[in-house]
Amino acid sequence: MAYEEGLVKAVGVSNYGKDALRACHKSLAERNIKLASNQIQFSLLYRYPLENGLLDTCKELDVKVLSYSPLALGFLTGKYSAANLPTGPRKKLGEKLFQSGNLSGLLEAMAIVSANHNGAPLSQVAINWCRAKGTIPIPGARTLKQARQNLEALDWNLSADEVRLLDEASAQVPAYIEADKSPFPKADINTGLVMFDS
């Protein structure tokens, strides 16, 4: 194994649900190897790992959570609205999210938090919500300005009241990707255990 040969410093997995994570953790522990991380989708618009207990399992096993897509394909940056939808495959998703009216409510809650922090970009609010849930967000950036804004999210934290406000607003938005329709594999190829288990 690359870890045992000293080629890598840590071992991590991606998109493992609770059962697959436990199986992997146990298998590695038998070889005296720590499972360092689980990279999963997580955001104000994709709370499934929080709701199904995966974040709790990661915490219990001392596995760091790397949360990808914390900006939910750009929908949590404030750049899109019902009148300004993205083009391409994300357009239908945008229509669904804005039709309910609840995404607008979430963005309004994010704007309230932003105002509490000198008008911080909504992207920073989204990133800091993930941080407040104990994850390490890994947002994408297309420009140097976006990369800098993402990094500046580390300069401040959400208060407990702000987290609560965002939790409540987020809970009103229907899941934009159903876990059982995820593009990721359903079962670990080695153990056969469900990755997006409930």
Model-derived features: positions:
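Short, surface-exposed polybasic-and-hydrophobic patches located at secondary-structure transitions
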Residues: 183-188
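Short coil/turn segments at secondary-structure boundaries
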Residues: 178-182
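Beta/alpha (TIM)-barrel catalytic core signal, keyed to glycine-rich beta->alpha loops juxtaposed to Asp/Glu
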Residues: 1-169, 173, 190-198
